[in-house]
């Protein structure tokens, strides 16, 4: 019993503990209660630990869960690795990405925060409410990742105060978790969050809108998702009419957008102040997983170098799939030339036989390993372009076809290919328009951990992936549950179908 709780519900870690040893750390309930959650300093530390554990959980899983099972990438070299299994659809129950323990550690941290923050001695009620908003939103986001990866998952909404009395809960269906846990958590966060919180490394009201709209799309409630994005644009401006005082904008200049991916946080001192935007100027990023070893320790260096490559002529774990490479190459073989080719990609070797994603490094640059891990490289969870393309998909499903294409137009304008926008007459069915939007998302958001989730949400996995790696069943949209979790669950969980 103790082992499963240590795996699925491990509690707050002390600073400096490595991610590989978390199952040996005493849970929060074994720390004397009078030493925790008493004042603003304690609460601030607890919230910081939520984000720290989230960084650890997503450091590699960001790529495993959102990218590597899709049609975006192939292996650069045929070496044994988790990504190899994912790309080839050789899913086994010993893969690290099939273990939900690190994600439930974040959830455990949020549960302790939600229970204890109301009783903390914090005179500023707006600040206390914002701390609660962070916890509710991060719990909602973690469960959102969980249901997209495994479908039905166990739900814990209370902290485990005593591991001897802890209950191993069964799995709750995905739709129920979305409807009864994730969306209510995000709505609670929206009601509590301080609108002046603009730091992109933490949850803001803008980020809550993004997660909420995304979750509503997965529930199939497109009207609600459309209304949520309308609230976002009312608060922060639309791509056609940005607000002058908004920190979140659709960046129409691809060079400035590239700079946001590459440079904006390098050398900027952390301020630990959520009302100050460390980026210093409006840009696309809304919520990011901030990788910075000087702030978060050696276990939180960015894996961009390892996965996508370190620059011109250098190796990487993966390169563009032949399918996606052909799409990009076709885009630069015509006039006008798509500017994303030179800003998002580079040749993986001198013969230019294949291409790496190069969004996160300056054009023409080659960066050594040590420099990359010292860079403050962010993994984007949501940026303004997400909002636009999510709403385009929503509009298509609501049969507002021209509105959907108008939104895609903004993205193509920035890419320098405005004239290549499709026309309504090009489509005979709603599904054809949705496929077109998903294709545009694939080109624009390559390397941002979106493609697999887009395929799963729209039930395109078998259609797209069967010719590539043989996926032949909708059940394979889900990941298997790690065998260690099953062994320790005492029969509470059944393996996902097909594994």
Where are these regions (language model features)?
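Bacterial Sec-dependent N-terminal signal peptides
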Residues: 1-30
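Conserved, well-structured interaction surfaces
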Residues: 39, 44-58, 79-150, 172-180, ...
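Elongated scaffold/linker segments in the mid-to-C-terminal portions of large proteins
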Residues: 38-42, 47, 51, 58, ...
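Acidic, glycine-rich segments characteristic of secretory precursors and extracytoplasmic regions
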Residues: 20-67, 112, 175, 492-499
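Alpha-helical solenoid repeat scaffolds, predominantly canonical TPR units
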Residues: 109, 113, 185, 228-231, ...
């Amino acid at each position: 019993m103790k082992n499963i709780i240590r795996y699925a519900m491990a509690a707050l870690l002390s600073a400096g503990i490595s991610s590989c040893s978390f199952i040996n750390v005493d849970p929060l309930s074994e720390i004397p209660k009078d030493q925790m959650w008493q004042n603003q300093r304690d609460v601030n530390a607890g919230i910081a630990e939520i984000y720290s554990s989230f960084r650890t959980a997503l450091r590699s899983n960001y790529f495993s869960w959102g990218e590597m099972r899709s049609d975006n990438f192939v292996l650069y070299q045929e070496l044994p690795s988790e990504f190899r299994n994912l790309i080839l659809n050789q899913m086994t129950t010993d893969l690290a990405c099939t273990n939900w323990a690190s994600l439930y550690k974040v959830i455990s941290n949020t549960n302790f925060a939600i229970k204890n923050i109301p009783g903390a001695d914090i005179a500023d009620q707006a600040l206390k409410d914002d701390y609660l908003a962070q916890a509710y939103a991060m719990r909602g986001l973690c469960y959102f990742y969980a249901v997209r990866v495994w479908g039905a998952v166990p739900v814990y909404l209370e902290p485990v105060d005593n591991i001897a009395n802890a209950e191993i809960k069964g799995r709750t269906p995905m739709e129920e978790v979305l409807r009864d846990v994730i969306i209510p958590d995000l709505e609670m966060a929206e009601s509590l969050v301080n609108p002046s919180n603009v730091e992109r490394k933490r949850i803001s009201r803008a980020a809550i809108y993004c997660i909420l709209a995304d979750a509503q799309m997965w529930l199939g409630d497109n009207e609600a998702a459309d209304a949520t994005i309308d609230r976002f644009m009312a608060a922060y401006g639309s791509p056609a009419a940005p607000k002058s005082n908004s920190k979140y904008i659709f960046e129409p200049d691809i060079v400035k957008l590239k700079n946001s991916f590459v440079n904006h946080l390098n050398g900027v001192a952390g301020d630990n102040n959520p009302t100050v935007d460390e980026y210093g100027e409006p840009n696309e990023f809304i919520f990011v997983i901030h990788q910075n070893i000087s702030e978060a320790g050696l276990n939180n260096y960015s894996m961009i170098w390892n996965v996508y490559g370190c620059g011109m002529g250098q190796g990487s774990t993966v390169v563009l799939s032949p399918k996606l490479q052909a799409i990009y190459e076709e885009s630069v073989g015509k006039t006008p030339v798509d500017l994303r080719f030179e800003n998002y990609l580079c040749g993986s070797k001198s013969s230019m036989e294949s291409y790496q994603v190069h969004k996160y490094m300056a054009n023409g640059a080659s960066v050594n390993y040590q420099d990359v891990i010292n860079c403050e490289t962010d993994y984007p969870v949501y940026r303004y372009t997400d909002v636009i393309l999510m709403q385009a998909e929503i509009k298509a499903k609501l049969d507002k076809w021209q509105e959907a294409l108008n939104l895609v137009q903004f993205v193509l304008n920035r890419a320098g290919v405005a004239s290549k926008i499709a026309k309504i007459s090009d489509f005979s069915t709603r599904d054809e328009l949705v496929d077109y939007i998903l294709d545009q998302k694939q080109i624009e958001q390559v390397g941002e951990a979106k493609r697999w989730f887009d395929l799963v949400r729209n039930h395109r996995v078998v259609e797209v992936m069967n010719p590539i790696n043989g996926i032949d069943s909708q059940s394979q949209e889900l990941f298997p549950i790690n065998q260690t979790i099953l062994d320790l669950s005492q029969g509470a969980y059944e393996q996902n179908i097909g594994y």
